[in-house]
Amino acid sequence: MMFISLVHHPVYDRRGNIQTSSITTFDIHDLARSSTTYGVERLYLVHPSPLQRQVAERILGFWEVGGGKEWNPLRSQALEVTRVTASLDLAIEDATKLTGEKPVLVATTAKTKEGQTTFGQLRKNLDRPTMIILGTGWGLAPEVIDRCDLVLEPIWGPTEFNHLSVRAAGAIICDRLLGKRNI
């Protein structure tokens, strides 16, 4: 069973400072659609600010019970996996309640580091509950990465350019870990 947590604090800004980033509609919609497509159990939007969580809840409410549900039922269905939480600890607690065991925490980063887990290695070990932790802004702060059990290798294409949106990275990660492999 796989979970995704989208962490908005603590993350880096473009100058390398620790910051809190804003929740965006695009991240919510696109990550929920990818999560639902690939069978992710829950997508957690993790933000410490009550006002930002309120914005996220309002967006979800419009699509889940408001006018958006009638206008676009598929989007409503995709958003059903999404939960808003104040901390990564609360997301982990919820996933633990659902599965009966604490998930393996897997940090993501665009930087290559020694000892990273490959997609192939992780894919073979998804028999345990696993939480993929995505960072917004310019990536997860060390305090988040350091508490994880594993750090996933970066996503590389055929070029040296390596700056994907978190939405694109999330979709690629879902496909590499959960996608059908008969191509």
Features from the language model and the residues they span:
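Short, well-ordered alpha-helix to beta-strand connector turns
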Residues: V40, K102, R128, C148-D149
